Amino acid sequence: KHYNKKANNFKEYSDMNMRYLRISGILQRKGRGMIIVPAKHILAEKLAKSTSNEEPIMVQYKRLCEGAELPTDNMDTAKALLNDLIKQMKGRQILFNINDLPLNTAAEINIARRRLENILSQTDEIQYAKEQCNQWQEIADYMELLIKGGGKRTYDDDNVIEVPKDETPAYLEWILWRASLAIDHMVNKPYEVRGFKLDSDFLPVSAAGGGKGDLYCEFNDFTILTEVTMSTSSRQEAMEGEPVRRHVSD
């Protein structure tokens, strides 16, 4: 009643907080809520147990600024996380090999775990790519939202798609990536096509960095290199045309 700021602040700040949680890789979307990523259950439990303490707030703040310890710095916890991940991957019949890696310290165990997490992530992304040919309507709906400069579309109580207005460049790259996967017949892997990072829900974290093309699609007889821009000015070709030629030559 007496709030003198924009009413949208309540929604926008909550959306940003949810996004930060997803970027952590520990939580993912489920309907309108969030759940713990199955592969990160033990880590989430350890983090939850380690956050409550009686230290003064300034002591906690100083430790965070200097680099707070993580549960995975403990060797027993690191082993438990690695063993849990191995169990999950065997249950899903995903091939892996870490026999060449030493497992004598927490740091070495975490290196092995990150290798497995990368294999698991790539496996999930390949499966996600295979599903895109059946997601053409959602892809088209995202494109319509991008044409409007962002917004939201509600299918039902548990299914809502959204393009944040300040993230349209990242979402344009992302939806063109999905459209390319839907066309299929590419010979390179889906994670080799994109130049941007994804969160655990396969949503874009940010736009692609510099130094290479936004999308790099390899087919049997040809390659398509895509540079994405939301610009509509007369300088659009100057901004994106030159980088494409340079990336092709590289």
Model feature map: region roles:
Residues 1-2, 19:
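Non-catalytic protein-protein interaction scaffold segments in large eukaryotic complex-forming proteins
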Residues 2-11:
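Short helix-coil junctions and helix-kink-helix linkers
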Residues 9-10, 18, 207-209:
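Short amphipathic alpha-helical surface micro-motifs
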Residues 14-19, 23-92, 110-117:
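Accessory beta->alpha helical hairpin/"wing" motif in late/C-terminal subdomains of nucleic-acid enzymes
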Residues 102, 108-109, 115-250:
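Catalytic core segments in nucleotide and nucleic-acid processing enzymes
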